[in-house]
Amino acid sequence: MSEDEISIEGDLFEEPEGFLPERPSSHFSTYKRKIPNAEPQEITMKLVGHNPLYGHLLWNAGIYTADYLDKHSDTLVQGKKILELGAASALPSLVCSLNHAKEVIVTDYPDPDLLSHMEYSFNDLKEKTKYELSPWKVKGYIWGHDLGELLFDEPGRKLAEEEKFDLIILSDLVFNHSEHHKLLDTCRQSLKRNGGKCLVVFSPHRPYLLQDDLSFFETAKQYQFKTEKIEMVTWKPMFEEDEETADIRARVYAFFLIPEWE
């Protein structure tokens, strides 16, 4: 059919105005460090406008994790190889990069928009601080998948012990109950046997499923991890609705997973 045989005014495939809601714009969030005289005192993150896995928000667990790593950087961060899973805002990794980590690998679901925002935050911090950041890489990674491809672009390659991580950060991930085994498998395969730790921090976003959140630590036994509770603190809940559950949603739990395998 030639163009002369049919004439349609306008764009046939253009959606009518207002047909779809406008996609939320990217936004910025600023974190203030609690360490006196820390430089820089503030870290600004560029967050996506919306993300189905809630990567568009800076959660209490992420702030707690950043605070904790900043405070204990001498034992947990300095000179250490660090992996963050499900990083979203990447705040804990940004703090690690300021605290002389040997290397920081920052991962989340391989969504180009989400990854580019994390990359932006690192580059912005690099430009704003007079101090050199630790080497970092932002990578897309699906929990339980090939680690050789993630770290070396070599599918199927197994990690030698010296290539594994001293610290793995899991901040606000255990709400995803169907993924517990995949998370733990990734940790089991990539954490150093001697001296390695996983830092697991979360808030109960769905209070009626708190026991399912905590089941993560029971499942961890199957992967030869010992659980050490750091603390449980109470902050202001992220959202004000449902006053009856506010006291549970305000909680922030922190644990270490310690390897027990030979």
Curated annotation (Swiss-Prot):
It is found in: Cytoplasm. It comes from the Eukaryota. GO terms for molecular function: N-terminal protein N-methyltransferase activity; protein methyltransferase activity; protein-lysine N-methyltransferase activity. Its EC number is 2.1.1.-. S-adenosyl-L-methionine binds at residues 59, 86-88, 108, 143, 171. GO terms for biological process: methylation; rDNA heterochromatin formation. Pfam families: Methyltransf_16. Keywords: Cytoplasm, Methyltransferase, S-adenosyl-L-methionine, Transferase. GO terms for cellular component: cytoplasm. Belongs to the class I-like SAM-binding methyltransferase superfamily. EFM7 family. S-adenosyl-L-methionine-dependent protein methyltransferase that trimethylates the N-terminal glycine 'Gly-2' of elongation factor 1-alpha, before also catalyzing the mono- and dimethylation of 'Lys-3'. This is Protein N-terminal and lysine N-methyltransferase EFM7.
